[in-house]
UniProtKB/Swiss-Prot annotation:
Gene3D superfamilies: 6.10.250.3130, S15/NS1, RNA-binding
GO biological process: translation
Biased composition (Basic and acidic residues): 1-21
Protein name: Small ribosomal subunit protein uS15
Keyword terms: Ribonucleoprotein, Ribosomal protein, RNA-binding, rRNA-binding
Main function: One of the primary rRNA binding proteins, it binds directly to 16S rRNA where it helps nucleate assembly of the platform of the 30S subunit by binding and bridging several RNA helices of the 16S rRNA.
GO molecular-function term, one example from the UniProt record: rRNA binding
NCBIfam families: S15_bact (TIGR00952)
Annotated segments matching region Disordered: 1-22
Amino acid sequence: MALSKEQKTETLKEFGLHETDTGSPEAQIALLTVRIRQLTEHLKYHKHDHHSRRGLLLLVGRRKGLLKYLAENNVDRYRSLIERLGLRR
């Protein structure tokens, strides 16, 4: 369920601070969100795939921590990001 190179590059161009940015919280959160959405779709059809469900929960927890970090350090960037990603918060 990994992201293809094209998906990753496109996501980083849209949400990264620059084209090759992979370390900023925005870029990491965006990549995690894309992976979470892919796994969510997978689990709709494979309800008994508990190993993938656990992986999904780990990704959600990692994203939650990064969102908390961003909210504490720069509220404007946080609000902009959740609006662009369409996250509920």
